């Protein structure tokens, strides 16, 4: 069956401002720079590689549909939505609230298309029109909690999609697996009390946000036990991530048996990413994707939707993403040109500290019903 693919030209037009992280600041002697760390060119280069590699011929292009207010309000507060409308209407846009998440004038349109792209792909996969798919959306979403924008994220795209699956499509159990290297704090916040969405975050311990993503953060009320954090030590690579998949993630998914799996697909755990200190390669992401796709085939008739999150290496992110796309289509196209350079740098042996960090999570899975 067809594999869906979402890209919109406007995803490459996200205005990240003139600074490298926060806005340029003459007083602090922070120079303007042409490429913010979250500059949209990185995602655009991924899309262009999908086309140049020939993978686009094996995908079904899906037009993004702008998320409605009703879609957004399933994950966010009315106050947050109104604030984003306000910032978007400023003559030159502005800071959405945390000092690093900028929105240009009219940027709300792109944010709606990003969340809406995830929703539209989810709808088509959930209804059987497509077997699976990849939404290469921008801006990302997993840091945005219920009431705010944060960490380059305006709306929480995976949560907006999960909310749609629950409220409109009638799904009773949805899982969100987030392997972006930074803690999925926004997703955790939105579903904290709700067992109808299982949230799993694999991330570098204490990277971003500060003081967030501990294994002890497990949800509350009826949602206790349905939020799983797997904080990994800096320097973790393919071996640690695959051990976490095998010992925690796949067991959690099989215990929960969701009707749909949504993957927050960030590639900032790669060896070449500037915003983390992990050592995953394109082949590591390939193997993680393969395991998750196979798990979906076993437990939810293959219904799986990948939604782009972070990743800040314009050099390597496209090839990490291509590896995941290839696992969806079942067609190999290009080898990883960085493989030989990275192969000897480590990350392929499971270290004791990594094993311990992962295996302390295993007993927590007993609370999933």
UniProtKB/Swiss-Prot annotation:
- What does UniProt list under activity regulation? Zinc, and cobalt and nickel at a lesser extent, are able to increase the catalytic activity (2.2-, 1.3- and 1.1-fold respectively) at concentrations of 1 mM. Higher concentrations have an inhibitory effect. Magnesium, manganese and calcium have no effect on activity at concentrations between 0 and 10 mM. At 100 mM, the catalytic activity is increased between 1.2- and 2.1-fold. Hydroxamates like TSA and SAHA inhibit the enzyme. Is also inhibited by azobenzenes, stilbenes and arylazopyrazoles.
Binding residues for Zn(2+) = 180, 182, 268
CDD domains, A to Z: HDAC_classII_1
What does UniProt list as this organism's lineage?
Bacteria, Pseudomonadati, Pseudomonadota, Betaproteobacteria, Burkholderiales
Record organism: Alcaligenes sp. (strain DSM 11172)
Q: Does the keyword Membrane apply?
A: no
Q: Which residues form the active site?
A: 143
Per the entry, the cofactor note is: Binds 1 zinc ion per subunit.
Q: What is this protein called?
A: Histone deacetylase-like amidohydrolase
Q: Which gene encodes it?
A: hdaH
- Reported EC number(s) for this entry are 3.5.1.-
- Asked if the keyword Cell inner membrane belongs to this entry, the reply reads no
What Pfam families does the record point to?
Answer: Hist_deacetyl
């Amino acid at each position: 069956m067809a594999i869906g693919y979402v890209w919109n030209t406007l995803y490459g037009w996200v205005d990240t401002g003139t600074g490298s992280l926060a806005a340029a600041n003459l007083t602090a002697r922070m120079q303007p720079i042409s490429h913010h760390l979250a500059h949209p060119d990185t995602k655009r280069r991924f899309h262009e590689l999908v086309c140049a590699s020939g993978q686009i011929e094996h995908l079904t292009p899906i037009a993004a549909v702008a998320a409605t207010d009703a879609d957004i309000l399933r994950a966010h507060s009315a106050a947050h939505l109104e604030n984003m409308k306000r910032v978007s209407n400023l003559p030159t846009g502005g800071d959405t609230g945390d000092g690093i998440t900028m929105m240009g004038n009219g940027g709300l349109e792109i944010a709606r298309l990003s969340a809406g792209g995830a929703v539209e792909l989810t709808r088509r996969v959930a209804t059987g029109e497509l077997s699976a798919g990849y939404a290469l959306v921008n801006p990302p979403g997993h840091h945005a909690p219920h009431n705010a924008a944060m960490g380059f994220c305006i709306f929480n795209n995976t949560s907006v999609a999960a909310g749609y699956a629950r409220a409109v499509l009638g799904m009773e159990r949805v899982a969100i697996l987030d392997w972006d290297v930074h803690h999925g704090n926004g997703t955790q916040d939105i579903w904290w009390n709700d067992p109808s969405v299982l949230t799993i975050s694999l991330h570098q311990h204490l990277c971003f946000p500060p003081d967030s993503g501990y294994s002890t953060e497990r949800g509350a009320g009826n949602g206790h036990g349905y939020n799983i954090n797997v904080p990994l030590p800096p320097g973790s690579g393919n071996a640690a991530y695959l051990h976490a998949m095998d010992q925690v993630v796949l067991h959690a998914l099989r215990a929960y048996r969701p009707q749909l799996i949504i993957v927050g697909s960030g590639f900032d755990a790669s060896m070449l990413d500037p915003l983390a200190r992990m050592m995953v390669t394109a082949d590591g992401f390939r193997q993680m994707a393969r395991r998750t796709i196979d798990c979906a085939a076993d437990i939810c008739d293959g219904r799986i939707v990948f939604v782009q999150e972070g990743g800040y290496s314009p050099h390597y992110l496209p090839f990490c993403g291509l590896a995941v796309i290839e696992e969806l289509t079942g067609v190999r196209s290009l080898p990883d040109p960085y493989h030989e350079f990275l192969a000897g740098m480590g990350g392929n042996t499971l270290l004791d500290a990594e094993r311990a960090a992962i295996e302390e999570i295993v007993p927590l899975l007993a609370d999933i019903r």
